[in-house]
Amino acid sequence: MASKNTYSDFKLATELPAWNQLQSLYEQKGKKLNVKDEFAKDNSRYEKFAKTFVNYDGSKILFDFSKNLVDDEILKSLIQLAKEAKVTSLRDAMFNGEPINFTEGRAVYHVALRNRSLKPMYVDGTNVTPEVDAVLQHMKEFTEEVRSGAWKGYTGKSITDVVNIGIGGSDLGPVMVTEALKHYATNLKVHFVSNIDGTHIAETLKDLDHETTLFLIASKTFTTAETITNATSAKNWFLSKNGGDQSHISKHFAALSTNATEVEKFGIDTKNMFGFENWVGGRYSVWSAIGLSVALYIGFDNFEAFLKGAEAVDKHFVETPLEDNIPLLGGLLSVWYNNFFDAQTHLVAPFDQYLHRFPAYLQQLSMESNGKSVTRGNVFANYSTGSILFGEPATNAQHSFFQLIHQGTKLIPSDFILAAQSHNPIENNLHQKMLASNFFAQAEALMVGKDEEQVKSEGATGGLVPHKVFSGNRPTTSILAQKITPATLGALIAYYEHVTFTEGAIWNINSFDQWGVELGKVLAKVIGSELATDNKISSHDSSTNGLINQFKEWI
């Protein structure tokens, strides 16, 4: 039963006085504000707008907001907007385990999963900390057994390969984190299967040895269609290799689920079942048992450091005044561009190959959370909400879509991420210095641009001149970490989680449900039964009928 408390006393963000004040500021100065001029006017601009986060282990991440299209007055009004939207009240409700996901009547408590200080955290009057810690201890024991070689397959061989079968949050998080922290891996290989396309599971199984492979089936309900279909194919492959002996399944399959009945029916020993509660949303689940593949890959101590890095950002988000609250500032800038500059997209470009899946992970976090059009006041929003988030690692991205960022007609606010220290400082750190020079240069170029006079001074004439002009004044946030460690990665993810939270709180939407994924699933079941027959289909619109019937002819 959904809670009636929508955690806001306004229906639309446009009702808030600060929203109207920001609209006036945009017209008066925002749309004409030139960042280059702002730097010239204020020698302390960088010191004022750059914020340093100190992690639990003393490592630092610098967030430079100074190249954004704001001044002191605009920033003050954005902070006032956060106050009027009661962002901190909603934040506190989340951290207190209240059911802020009101359409499903659930708490939003992924923050409890990284509570390594083990302080009491309650949902419905129950302290969930002991249960969360018990699952982590179970993960630790299992991880150490597998990594040490003590866990044996049915022929007595140790595990060499782990295959995580999941989809959505049960896949995107573990894939991204294992790639990002590959430097910390030892000899265990991890593979991920998510797509229902048979190619994904077939290509993954092709080179694996069934005697040394461990499968993790990641599905809270153990009924997710794509995941259970892929898991069943994996089980059939395993049985085809071992002579069909079902008793061996328990040595090669574990479940990340809470449905003991279905897990047991599948053949998995429930001792190897790792659960998590319904207050853990899929896109926030990498901190839970869903992160078991990560712990197996990098070791439990590193996984715990990953949790602690996120916990440190949680502490910052809760305790830091709004003016210096790094995730809150990131979220407010996003609202400023989306709603007042009509920016429809947001670029995240990591200047780090290990982070090559980070933008894909953030796509789900941002777009599934804030791709909503109805507010907590149960009315349709009369303003834009979630941005289209995209990105690729740089410098590759510079040779593909950066042209659009520099000279296109759309304003695309961008986040650039770099670690100062490389895990691979080859050629006397030459590669890292080239990478860093591009990180700094791209942000500077987007800000300063190049005017006609400069273009002409470089020898361009006539009709070529306008083609070589860069308007500049394109906003960027530069995020500079010391090194990509488990703690740093945990902190970066938590930063973007709380940015997303802040956006949703301002827009007064529920960032924690995802009804938009349901309709397609329902229709897919109907069409699935139609594909099982040879009959010509005529029950849909002519386009869908035509496509289905052509598919049936060609299959």
From Swiss-Prot:
PROSITE patterns: P_GLUCOSE_ISOMERASE_1, P_GLUCOSE_ISOMERASE_2, P_GLUCOSE_ISOMERASE_3
Gene Ontology MF terms in the entry: carbohydrate derivative binding; glucose-6-phosphate isomerase activity; monosaccharide binding
Lineage: superkingdom: Eukaryota
Protein name: Glucose-6-phosphate isomerase
Major site of localization recorded for this protein: cytoplasm
Active-site residue list: E368, H399, K521
Organism: Kluyveromyces lactis (strain ATCC 8585 / CBS 2359 / DSM 70799 / NBRC 1267 / NRRL Y-1140 / WM37)
Subunit field text: Homodimer.
Catalytic activity: alpha-D-glucose 6-phosphate = beta-D-fructose 6-phosphate
UniProt pathway: Carbohydrate degradation; glycolysis; D-glyceraldehyde 3-phosphate and glycerone phosphate from D-glucose: step 2/4
Coiled coil ranges: none
EC code: 5.3.1.9
Cross-referenced Gene3D superfamilies: 1.10.1390.10, Glucose-6-phosphate isomerase like protein, domain 1 (3.40.50.10490)
Subcellular location: Cytoplasm, Cytosol
Cited InterPro entries: G6P_Isomerase, G6P_Isomerase_C, Phosphoglucose_isomerase_CS, SIS_dom_sf, SIS_PGI_1, SIS_PGI_2
Name of a matching Pfam family: PGI
Record-stated family: Belongs to the GPI family.
CDD domains: SIS_PGI_1, SIS_PGI_2
Gene Ontology terms: biological process: gluconeogenesis; glucose 6-phosphate metabolic process; glycolytic process
